[in-house]
């Protein structure tokens, strides 16, 4: 992250909420509630990292610190800022380009291992739309958690209907049609294209996609930037659509996965440009516990290498849109599937999903030849007056069950 200068090595222990090092593990807390909200999930990653909640340490932290800083509220802000700096350092080491929060100045009274220098007045401005959305999600999720506490969601999950096999549906579609399995996207708008469909009825569109041969559906749940909503996901599931549903959300917190499960999701999206390896590993554990599939999205070779180093991933999405220029180049799919990466994917029998820039049968043929077994398509079919015909036009023939 520009302007972040580590002044000294990590200390042996930093009071919670923070990151501390013990003999063979590291624990990370994102905030008061913590990134690891589910105490029941314990695991040991190959790097000997583990995540666990440490709620009780917070009171000790405030008690110890109050002698030097009178304002306990500021002590808490200092500790939260401190762990964010550690997380940013970890993200930088993994080549993650999306900053999780604005690089604001440290809180009053801070004295620690990090020094933040702002080189220009735009340091607190998002560098691209994905970063802007990520920053907004952090605020939005904090607000939603107050309305829907995790304990309430866990109880709701127990009463939720069982999930459908998202990965299995893609494999079956690929076998049945000879084409990549289609994940058709229910999307009203996007930041780059604006309104895609004025008369937007999510249930009607979902039913048309299913009739047209879609194996699975992707439902945008972001309201601010895509004019979607969790109510769309819930309505499609309640309407009896049989296609497994991907919750297309920008996940920055485990709470969102529980919430998606209560609204009818069968799968969730995890973006490698936003999430550190340790976070992806932990979120995959939650997905497994909730019987959800996870589509892990990458944009470049470094992200692909990171993802292939994480156990438990079955679905990898290659987004052909550049984070820097926002230009779309479907040759990115071929590039990322060549050489060692492609060999590992074939050996592990992973499903690669081609994303962005797919409009014609030639586009589908190109990414299929590169090695994808599924495609995620939104704009080119949602804009059609008849989505069924749009799907047939995309593949060059009818791929429906009839």
UniProtKB/Swiss-Prot annotation:
GO terms for molecular function: copper ion binding; indole-3-glycerol-phosphate synthase activity. NCBIfam families: PRK00278.1-4 (NF001372), PRK00278.2-4 (NF001377). It catalyses: 1-(2-carboxyphenylamino)-1-deoxy-D-ribulose 5-phosphate + H(+) = (1S,2R)-1-C-(indol-3-yl)glycerol 3-phosphate + CO2 + H2O. Residues 1-65 form a transit peptide. One of its GO terms (cellular component) is chloroplast. Disulfide bonds: none annotated. It is found in: Plastid, Chloroplast. Expressed in leaves. Belongs to the TrpC family. It is an enzyme of class 4 (lyase). The gene is IGPS. Keywords: Amino-acid biosynthesis, Aromatic amino acid biosynthesis, Chloroplast, Decarboxylase, Lyase, Plastid, Transit peptide, Tryptophan biosynthesis. This is Indole-3-glycerol phosphate synthase, chloroplastic. Pathway: Amino-acid biosynthesis; L-tryptophan biosynthesis; L-tryptophan from chorismate: step 4/5. GO terms for biological process: L-tryptophan biosynthetic process. Indole-3-glycerol phosphate synthase required for tryptophan biosynthesis. Its EC number is 4.1.1.48.
């Amino acid at each position: 992250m520009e302007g972040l200068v580590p002044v000294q090595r990590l200390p042996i222990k930093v009071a919670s909420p923070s990151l501390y090092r013990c003999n063979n593990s590291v624990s990370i807390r994102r905030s008061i509630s913590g990134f690891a909200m589910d105490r029941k999930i314990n695991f040991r990653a190959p790097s000997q990292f583990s995540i666990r909640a440490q709620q009780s340490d917070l009171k000790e932290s405030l008690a110890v610190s109050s002698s030097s800083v009178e304002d306990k509220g500021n002590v808490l802000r200092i500790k939260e800022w401190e762990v964010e700096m550690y997380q940013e350092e970890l993200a930088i080491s993994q080549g993650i380009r999306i900053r999780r929060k604005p690089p604001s100045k440290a809180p009053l009274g801070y004295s620690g291992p990090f020094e933040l220098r702002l080189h220009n007045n735009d340091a607190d401005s998002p560098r691209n739309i994905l970063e802007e959305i990520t920053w907004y999600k952090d605020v939005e999720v904090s607000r939603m958690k107050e309305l829907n506490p995790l304990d309430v969601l866990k109880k709701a999950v127990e009463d939720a209907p069982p999930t459908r096999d998202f990965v299995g549906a893609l494999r079956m579609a690929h076998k049945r049609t000879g084409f990549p399995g289609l994940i058709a996207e229910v999307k009203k708008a996007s930041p780059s294209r604006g309104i895609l469909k004025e008369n937007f009825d999510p249930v009607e569109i979902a039913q048309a996609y299913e009739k047209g041969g879609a194996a699975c559906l992707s439902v945008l749940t972001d309201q601010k930037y895509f004019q979607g909503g969790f109510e769309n996901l819930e309505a499609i599931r309640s309407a009896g659509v049989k296609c497994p549903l991907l919750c297309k959300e920008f996940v920055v917190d485990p709470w969102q996965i529980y919430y998606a499960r209560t609204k009818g999701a069968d799968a969730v999206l995890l973006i490698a440009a936003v999430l550190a390896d340790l976070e992806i590993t932990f979120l995959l554990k939650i997905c497994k516990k909730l019987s959800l599939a996870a589509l892990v999205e990458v944009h470049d070779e470094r992200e692909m290498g990171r993802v292939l180093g994480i156990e438990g991933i079955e679905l990898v999405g290659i987004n052909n849109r550049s984070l820097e220029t926002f230009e779309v180049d479907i040759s990115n799919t071929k590039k990322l599937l060549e050489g060692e990466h492609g060999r590992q994917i074939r050996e592990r029998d992973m499903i690669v999903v081609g994303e962005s820039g797919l409009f014609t049968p030639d586009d589908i043929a190109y990414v299929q030849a590169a090695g994808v077994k599924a495609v995620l398509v939104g704009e080119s079919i949602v804009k059609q007056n008849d989505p069924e015909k749009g799907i047939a036009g995309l593949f060059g023939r009818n791929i429906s069950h009839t």
